[in-house]
Amino acid sequence: MTFHRSQNLREVATKHCYQIQGPDAVRGVGGWDTHVNQGSTSGQLANNLANLGEGLVAYAQALGEEWNNTTVVVLSEFGRTFRENGSRGTDHGHGTVYWVLGGNVRGGRIVGEQVAVNPQSLLQNRDYPVLNNYRNLLGGLLGRTWGLSASQLQNVFPGARPDALQLL
């Protein structure tokens, strides 16, 4: 399921609270391929971030008290280049960020491995490096949230070293 507006996440929250029993779900949000005219404080990227933020707020509000039992992870399968391309956008890159939200998340901080952004740390002088493997993060969060064993997590994320980064 792909979302483009906060109303969609509000509807999902309603279904989550009243129809779904047990752990749920992977949801997608499209429209993030910003090769052309990405913008910064205005434009495609700013609009997408605003819509995502509004959707997440609507989702949390619609869940009400159930938000305290909910963990949301926002991630992308790839990052974007640190440097702008010739079309005023960014191309597919390597490193990215993950957002972890929820009523039981110890947030309000940046966690995981980090490096200063400088020419020496960028791959091909344009890409932020992959420092935090999504398999490790998701494995750690799923293990803590759903009580999955190390062997169960290895079936889903072979070779991963689950680490919830002290977020839960």
Feature roles, as predicted:
Residues 1-168:
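Ligand-binding pockets and gating/stacking loops
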